[in-house]
């Protein structure tokens, strides 16, 4: 007891403070070492007619062990997918193959990781245990990419979460802005002033340091056409990426293949709608993919669809892919 009493109380007090600070530092270390980052997948206008196919932002710098949560913010489906280097891209219905279905996963570059197609309000968290630069893709949309730079904890990070929040907001605003004025572009190289024509969607692809971002307009421009019996309406898809359909009657289970159509000499598909009970479907309309070195050149894409209406009536149509976003129209046929 004598030895203990000889220790000054001030020294014991300082030692207690030091121990408390040390314990607090240990408790806070895991939070610093395993930071939680936030990003967004997709964006849309209030009407759903403009869809940003983009990771917002599409470039992040984090430390090994950190988590990133992607929150989906559009009614258009997307995936968050990290593939192995050199892996062949698979369809979004297939996944990597397979999907991580429990809302979280881990990616170290050796095994593919993908969410299933998700929509507004859903989220997915990925842990990155290994340093590296990892490409982020959406399996639904080819020109929707990003990158996550995973650094060793000894290296400083260039940005914090507030920077990414601001960048995401700026990119969202830029993509969805009316400044693009896409809806008022015209097909100057294909003059059909004497015909009834409809622009079946339009879009624009942009790029930054993280990859590609895309705006698509999921609308038929001038969707209601008034014609006379025996006349023909022509739809053209102006979008460089998105596929659309023109569908009368029952929507097919597989939207890719056309139903009750023939092919005109210029490659456009052609259907005839005699009554509201007819089922006529364009199949997917879209531009051909870009030519690539060492791969066979793809044939021209099918971008146009024509329908002749022999009889009077009202004939509603829809895009079988984006009808849920409001991509619909109507042809009114007068005698």
Segments (PLM) and residue ranges:
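Extracytoplasmic copper-binding redox domains, predominantly the cupredoxin/blue-copper superfamily
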Residues: 34-335
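Bacterial N-terminal signal peptides
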Residues: 16-28
